[in-house]
């Protein structure tokens, strides 16, 4: 009888070890799958802005060298999934003053004010062919047909990804 008990214990141990091994394998597989999904849920951003764009304050800025009229400047930005720059805060104004050398077409926000610059707008953008031009630290009303440089702006890749997928 004692030999029979040893055989039963041996079979039970073998069965238990097999079940534990399979459970460990299943848990390990689940761990690998979850880790991979988590890892790939957060893309690797080697660059948050495209080549030739400058990153600042969660946005990317593109300063053109070629000059175009205001309408073509707006179209150029649209083609690059961006928009003509607007000065919605003093930080953006200071950034462009520091890096943008020359005159650039700008857009204006709906309340038609630019922080840090005191001036009055008596016109609507694009009406009567008058548009806004930023020159170092001044805003100038200018005919939209003149050719000037452009600054396009868009969210950086990380900010865009975060607002798309994490909220």
Swiss-Prot record:
Disulfide bonds join 77-152, 131-144. The keyword Flavoprotein does not apply. SMART domains: CLECT. PROSITE patterns: C_TYPE_LECTIN_2. Residues 49-152 form the C-type lectin domain. Keywords: Disulfide bond, Lectin. Coiled coil: none annotated. The keyword Disulfide bond applies. One of its GO terms (molecular function) is carbohydrate binding. SUPFAM superfamilies: C-type lectin-like. InterPro entries: C-type_lectin-like (IPR001304), C-type_lectin-like/link_sf (IPR016186), C-type_lectin/matrix_domain (IPR050828), CTDL_fold (IPR016187). PANTHER family: C-TYPE LECTIN DOMAIN FAMILY 2 MEMBER D, C-TYPE LECTIN DOMAIN-CONTAINING PROTEIN 180. This is Putative C-type lectin protein FPV008/FPV253. It comes from Fowlpox virus (strain NVSL) (FPV).
């Amino acid at each position: 009888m004692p030999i029979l008990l040893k055989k039963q214990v041996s079979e039970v141990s073998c069965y238990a070890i097999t079940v534990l091994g399979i459970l460990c394998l299943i848990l390990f597989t689940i761990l690998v799958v979850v880790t991979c999904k988590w890892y790939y849920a957060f893309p690797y951003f080697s660059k948050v802005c495209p080549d030739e764009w400058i990153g600042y304050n969660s946005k990317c800025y593109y300063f053109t060298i070629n000059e175009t009229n205001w309408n073509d400047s707006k179209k150029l930005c649209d083609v690059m999934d961006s928009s003509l720059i607007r000065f919605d805060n003093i930080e953006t104004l200071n950034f462009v003053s520091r890096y943008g050398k020359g005159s650039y077409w700008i857009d204006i926000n709906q309340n038609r004010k630019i922080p840090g610059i005191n001036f009055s707008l008596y016109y609507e953008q694009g009406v009567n062919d008058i548009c806004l031009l930023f020159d170092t630290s001044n805003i100038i009303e200018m005919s939209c047909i003149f050719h000037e440089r452009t600054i396009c702006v868009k969210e950086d890749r990380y900010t865009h990804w975060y607002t798309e997928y994490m909220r």
